[in-house]
Structures are given as C-alpha cells and as structure tokens.
Amino acid sequence: MIDYIKSPVLKFKLIRLLEKNQYTFDVDPKATKTDVKYWVENFFGVKVIGMNSHRPPRKMKRMGPTIGYPVRYKRMIVTLRAGDSIPLF
C-alpha cells in the first residue's frame, strides 16, 4: 500500500512551500486523500492537518517517430502541524 506515494517533488516553486510546512508528493492516480494521509502519518510519524490534490496537465512527448502522452499522475500537497517536519527534505 505504500506504493500510493511515488516520490517527493523538489522543484523551485514547490520548495518555497516548505517554509509554510507544506510538502509535495507525486502519488498514484487512484489514491485518495484519506489513503495518502494515512500513509504519510504512519510512515513519517507526523500529523497532517490539510491536503490539496491536483492532476497537472498532460504534455505531448515525442518518442522516436511517434507522438504520445506520458503516464498521468496525481500531485498531493500535504500541510503538517506546526513543529512537525519530514526528514527527507
């Protein structure tokens, strides 16, 4: 079940959210907010107080002579209680 959380996202705009105690993860498209909250709280030992999710727009990719779309994913922004932090970041 931990496969719901694919990877943390470290981009310039999202790094600024770390100052607000918000962490961003790419998750499985089938994952719900409840699933991700459960795994973040149990795996990292923190308290989640808010979550936002969105699906970034798809962009065309050229793969040799063919044009296609990469696999879709969902992105979750997790807000933690003041004083909590995730050691990965």
From Swiss-Prot:
GO terms for cellular component: chloroplast; ribonucleoprotein complex; ribosome. Pfam families: Ribosomal_L23. One of its GO terms (molecular function) is structural constituent of ribosome. Keywords: Chloroplast, Plastid, Ribonucleoprotein, Ribosomal protein, RNA-binding, rRNA-binding. PANTHER family: 60S RIBOSOMAL PROTEIN L23A (PTHR11620). Part of the 50S ribosomal subunit. This is Large ribosomal subunit protein uL23c.
